[in-house]
């Protein structure tokens, strides 16, 4: 081994370690062995380690080499000296790379461990200190972008040192260096960098320090620097809240809840750093706590159980409540399992008896005992659907036992008075959870491997199996994940195989059980969007032509179930596509024009007057007349196969709502009688036309208020007839067509019930009572929404109401109604919250920092803004850049600036002239598909950023750099600096 090592060069060592993906520890060890045999020359060190030729290296190799050299550098003082000696000799771009990795090491975000205390001190007080001093001495006004970038990264490293390890820093020496940095930043007019540096060094620098030689070249720049320091002091005052005060504790609880609720709303359950984020943001002092595992477990349990109670009291959407419940039952035990309770966390010499409370059982018991009466009342009688009731605490403990987190005997240790649950019952539960069969096998048996010609949907057992899943998988996180993965894979497989009949069976079964659908979405990495985008892309890329297919009505029905599945997901999970238009996307156009806007944007006026266009329009008018006669004329033979096949199914789904709207209007005008209208409505019970009833129902509900809203007005009569013709009598067996229409009612049911119950004395109408009964029986009780609206005081400023709400919550720990905070971003139509916060900062200045409530309101409001705006690290970096940018945004005079779309002419002929058909043919030849989901996701991101409250800051941030010295401008600068500070350290969701 020794002889072979002697022949190994540094070049080969680096190459071998990269190939094997060796850790930095392994590399350092091998490097030291190599250097013992033969000293490594400086040129070899430079060319193979410090600045290797990266042209022929992958990104992974380059990253590994960076780790290797830095790990080597901090392994000893001699290696450290060597690294910093040669670092200034390499390209600036490479130096930037090392600064980034060095900062990651300091923030413990690198694969390399933080250096020892002695090495760390040597870096910051000697090596990095000299490197910085030498570099800034070489700078002058007009420096290049690369030089600025390196300077900024050097500043970032220093700021990380100050925030994380100020006690290692020689403060007096650093002050001298900091003054030079401020001077260079001022001379080079790098205002954003200057503000950032001063704001992060305010604990070390003061106004007097800044006046020492730093800005002597310019009185204006000196004033600007001092003004910045004054602003920073105000930021610090606003941010400084006594962490031990009761109000600070309650503020932390509110922030914690808002974050957890956003997770439940936005499907962020698969966050691998959840525990780390929870601890860093809401338990800042736990790292030094001898009882850290106990404290973390206790706070987690309190946060989730009080959180779900708060969401119930805040009238959250039903899917959000389900997500809370399912997280508590399946994910919370997993999180608690990741908290290791060991004897190392006990202080045996302490006389404090509380140190004995270090087991998970103790954390659970003490958390439950800490709940206030209002919390216990909700938990012990827990129900989402107002029908099935359980004690959520007991359900959670059962899950912990079934998943072997705690032993069976813990149940009666926690619930000493409960004699209804025996040890045998709990052992049976453990056995049942462990014996759940393969989800994939069940789908193979009940769907994928059957012959649909010989096995009906009912005989396949698929519906019964889908309905059994919520109860079967209630306590098994792994099986729930398997379910989501299986359904996702099956849908993708069936779409690839174009097996639309089996896709129809799957969607019909799943969409008739919203709890199963919610369960699938909960355990998907992308929430509901994984399934949703697959269906959207399929609709947009498949033409669904039937040609001579004798079963064309089935094909049309299969198309309809996909449309309904998309709309069901959108409605159930509160997804808003009303501001999105995608080029050549049939489904997005359909959702917007025929579902949201109910054909309001359409007109029968042509935008062209050529003979050819007029002929086409005339032919289409004749075709529509044929459909009207077939649907509503008693003397006609009804809808013939030839007539149905004369129009593509995509066109039918746009045409039918218009025809029926006009027929209802004609009936209301006495142009046709109700009998003729009812004859036409009977056709809507045909499977392939059932999905069209959804648009008609939505239109009828709106029409109730457009007409005279009497109890038995025409829209109510039509709605009743429509439901009766599709549902039949309640004692009839459930057919596929009935299941089909039940999906329509699951989508529209909440709107139907809430609209009809707003009519005066609705209880006196037999028609309305019959409608509500049929709808209530079809909609899953768990997803029958309460009235989600909130009553606002029109006479009080919206932002004053928010402030009052926040102060009440901070001052009263027994208030659990957070609805106003939860929905504030959706009701703040004017996006004026930022202006109001600036006014509050002004008010705070006038009281000389004496108003604690104002300070708390400012902090919580900014937290709410960031939580709403930042969904990932890309968002965070985007907003940091935008807010630091002093460029005035270009304003738009377009009336459609709040909507990202492509203009098009809306007229009836557009129903037939679908632009997506031509594009789909192009894709057939090119072998590519129209990926609408990618475009939708991109537009969602743009719209989210455009509508973010942070975006409204762009309208006023230009005043930050004005020379006017007003209280408002000072407040605005303070807000900007506070915002930047909060953004820099914001780690939630990223």
From Swiss-Prot:
Key words, A-Z: Activator, Nucleus, Transcription, Transcription regulation
Statement: the UniProt record of this protein carries the keyword Transcription: yes
GO cellular component: mediator complex
GO terms, biological process: regulation of transcription by RNA polymerase II
One Pfam family per UniProt: Med5
Domain of life of the source: Eukaryota
Disulfide bonds: none
Main subcellular localisation: nucleus
Cell compartment(s), UniProt: Nucleus
Stored InterPro entries: Mediator_Med5_fun
Family affiliation: Belongs to the Mediator complex subunit 5 family.
Known role: Component of the Mediator complex, a coactivator involved in the regulated transcription of nearly all RNA polymerase II-dependent genes. Mediator functions as a bridge to convey information from gene-specific regulatory proteins to the basal RNA polymerase II transcription machinery. Mediator is recruited to promoters by direct interactions with regulatory proteins and serves as a scaffold for the assembly of a functional preinitiation complex with RNA polymerase II and the general transcription factors.
SUBUNIT field: Component of the Mediator complex.
Protein name per Swiss-Prot or TrEMBL: Mediator of RNA polymerase II transcription subunit 5
Organism this protein belongs to: Debaryomyces hansenii (strain ATCC 36239 / CBS 767 / BCRC 21394 / JCM 1990 / NBRC 0083 / IGC 2968) (Yeast)
Gene name for this UniProt entry: NUT1
């Amino acid at each position: 081994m020794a002889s072979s090592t002697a022949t190994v060069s540094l070049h080969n060592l680096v190459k071998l370690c990269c190939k094997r993906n060796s850790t930095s520890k392994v590399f350092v060890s091998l490097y030291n062995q190599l250097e013992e045999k033969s000293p490594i020359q400086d040129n070899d060190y430079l060319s193979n380690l410090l600045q290797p030729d990266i042209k022929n290296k992958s990104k992974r190799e380059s990253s590994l080499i960076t780790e290797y050299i830095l790990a080597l550098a901090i392994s000893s003082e001699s290696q450290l000296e060597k690294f910093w000696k040669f670092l200034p000799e390499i390209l600036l771009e490479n130096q930037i790379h090392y600064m980034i990795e060095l900062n990651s090491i300091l923030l413990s975000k690198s694969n390399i461990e933080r250096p020892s205390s002695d090495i760390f001190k040597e870096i910051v007080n000697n090596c990095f200190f000299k490197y910085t001093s030498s570099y800034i001495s070489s700078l002058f006004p007009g420096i290049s972008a690369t030089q600025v970038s390196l300077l900024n990264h050097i500043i970032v490293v220093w700021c990380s040192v100050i925030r994380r390890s100020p006690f290692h820093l020689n403060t007096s020496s650093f002050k001298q260096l900091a003054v030079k940095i401020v001077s260079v930043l001022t001379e080079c007019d790098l205002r954003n960098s200057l503000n950032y540096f001063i704001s992060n060094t305010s604990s070390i620098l003061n106004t007097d320090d800044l006046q020492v030689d730093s800005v002597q070249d310019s009185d204006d720049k000196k004033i600007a620097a001092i003004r910045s320091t004054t602003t920073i002091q105000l930021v610090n005052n606003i941010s400084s809240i006594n962490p031990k005060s009761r109000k600070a504790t309650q503020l932390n609880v509110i922030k914690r809840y808002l974050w957890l609720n956003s997770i439940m709303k936005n499907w962020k359950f698969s966050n691998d750093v959840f525990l780390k984020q929870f601890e860093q943001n809401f338990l800042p002092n736990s790292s030094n706590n001898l009882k850290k595992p106990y404290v973390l477990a206790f706070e987690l349990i309190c946060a989730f159980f009080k959180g779900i109670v708060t969401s119930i009291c805040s009238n959250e959407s039903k899917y959000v409540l389900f997500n809370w419940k399912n997280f508590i039952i399946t994910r919370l035990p997993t999180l608690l399992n990741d908290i290791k309770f060991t004897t190392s966390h006990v202080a045996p010499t302490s006389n404090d008896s509380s140190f004995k409370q270090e087991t998970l059982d103790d954390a659970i018991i003490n958390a439950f005992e800490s709940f206030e009466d209002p919390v216990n009342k909700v938990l012990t009688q827990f129900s989402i659907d107002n029908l099935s009731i359980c004690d959520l605490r007991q359900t959670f403990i059962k899950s912990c036992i079934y998943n072997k987190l705690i032993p069976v005997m813990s149940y009666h240790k926690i619930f000493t008075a409960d004699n209804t649950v025996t040890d045998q019952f709990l052992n049976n539960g453990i056995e049942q959870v462990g014996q759940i069969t393969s989800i994939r096998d069940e789908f193979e048996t009940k769907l994928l491997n059957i012959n649909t010609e010989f096995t009906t949907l009912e005989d396949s057992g698929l519906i019964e199996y889908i309905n059994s899943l919520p109860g079967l998988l209630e306590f098994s996180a792994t099986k729930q994940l398997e379910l989501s993965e299986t359904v996702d894979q099956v849908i993708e497989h069936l779409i690839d195989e174009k097996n639309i009949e089996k896709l129809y069976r799957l969607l019909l079964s799943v969409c008739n059980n919203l709890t199963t659908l919610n369960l699938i979405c909960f355990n998907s990495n992308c929430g509901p969007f994984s399934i949703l985008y697959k269906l959207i892309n399929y609709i947009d890329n498949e033409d669904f032509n039937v040609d001579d297919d004798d079963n064309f009505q089935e094909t049309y029905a299969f198309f309809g179930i996909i449309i309904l599945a998309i709309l069901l997901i959108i409605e159930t999970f509160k997804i808003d596509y009303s501001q999105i238009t995608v080029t050549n996307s049939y489904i997005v156009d359909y959702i917007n024009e025929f579902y949201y806007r109910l054909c309001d944007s359409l007109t029968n006026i042509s935008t062209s007057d050529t003979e050819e266009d007029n002929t086409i329009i005339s032919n289409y008018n004749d075709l529509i007349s044929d459909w009207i006669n077939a649907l509503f004329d008693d003397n006609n033979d009804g809808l013939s196969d030839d007539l149905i096949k004369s129009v593509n199914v995509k066109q039918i789904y746009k045409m039918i709502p218009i025809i029926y709207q006009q027929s209802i209007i004609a009936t209301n005008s006495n142009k046709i009688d109700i009998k003729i209208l009812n004859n036409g409505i009977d056709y809507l019970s045909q499977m392939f036309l059932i999905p069209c009833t959804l648009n008609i129902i939505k239109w009828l509900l709106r029409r109730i208020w457009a007409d005279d809203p009497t109890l038995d007005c025409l829209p109510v009569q039509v709605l009743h007839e429509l439901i009766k013709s599709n549902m039949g009598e309640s004692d009839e067996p459930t057919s596929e067509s009935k299941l089909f229409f039940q999906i329509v009612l699951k989508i529209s049911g909440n709107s139907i019930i809430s609209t009809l119950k707003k009519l005066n004395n609705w209880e006196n109408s037999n028609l309305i009572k019959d409608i509500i009964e049929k709808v209530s029986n079809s909609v899953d009780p768990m997803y029958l929404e309460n009235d989600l609206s909130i009553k606002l005081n029109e006479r009080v400023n919206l932002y004053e109401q928010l402030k009052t709400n926040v102060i009440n919550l901070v001052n009263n720990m027994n208030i659990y109604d957070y609805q106003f905070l939860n929905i504030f971003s959706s009701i703040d139509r004017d996006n004026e919250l930022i202006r109001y916060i600036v006014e509050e900062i002004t008010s705070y200045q006038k009281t000389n920092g004496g108003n604690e409530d104002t300070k708390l309101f400012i902090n919580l409001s900014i937290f709410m803004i960031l939580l709403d705006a930042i969904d990932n690290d890309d968002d965070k970096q985007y907003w940091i850049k935008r807010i630091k940018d002093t460029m005035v945004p270009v304003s738009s005079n377009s009336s459609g600036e709040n909507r990202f779309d492509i203009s098009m002419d809306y007229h009836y002929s557009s129903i037939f002239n679908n632009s997506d058909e031509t594009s789909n043919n192009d894709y057939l030849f090119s072998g590519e598909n129209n990926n609408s989901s990618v475009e939708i996701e991109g537009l969602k991101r743009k719209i989210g950023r455009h509508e973010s409250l942070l975006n409204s800051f762009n309208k006023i941030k230009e005043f930050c750099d004005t020379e006017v010295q007003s209280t408002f401008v000072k407040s605005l600068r303070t807000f900007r600096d506070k915002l930047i500070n909060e953004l820099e350290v914001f780690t939630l969701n990223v």
